[in-house]
Amino acid sequence: EGINNLKTVNDNAGIAPVEVDEAIIDLLNDCKRYHELTVGMVNPAMGSVLALWHEARDDGINDPAHAYLPDSEKLAEAATHMDPDAVVIDEAASTVYLSDPKMRLDVGAVAKGWSVQRVCENAPEGLLISVGGNVCATGAKDDSGTPWVVGIQNPDGGEEYLHTLYVTKGSV
């Protein structure tokens, strides 16, 4: 109780701005920047659309014989509520307001990598931090500058890596 997060913001869509921690403001500002950089491919405001897909996925997992795709009309309706400009961030007041009452935020495409990057920014030099597919190096492996070796797994399975990267500083 007393902690406001993205669920609280979503619950107050179209109702009132919600005071949030500075980290949420930073995350949402970065999400908006990623939206611009990717020409809309990353959109933190598409939670209403993603909720329909998540529901269909979960229902299919629980009852595979009755798996289904989300209704196209419901998807089209939800897609009218994903304008990132309707995410109103007031940094001075540390609030977030969704001006569209049917909009929902979903930062799943960004949050894990973003969080790992924040950890790495404050970590000592010479670490390799791996969190579920997001990898960040904070410096060379040793004093001689040896890079970390990061293997890119084949999403189709198999033992062989698709590619090997040599990283001293940065995220993969």
What is the role of each PLM region?
Residues 1-172:
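Mature catalytic core of soluble alpha/beta enzymes
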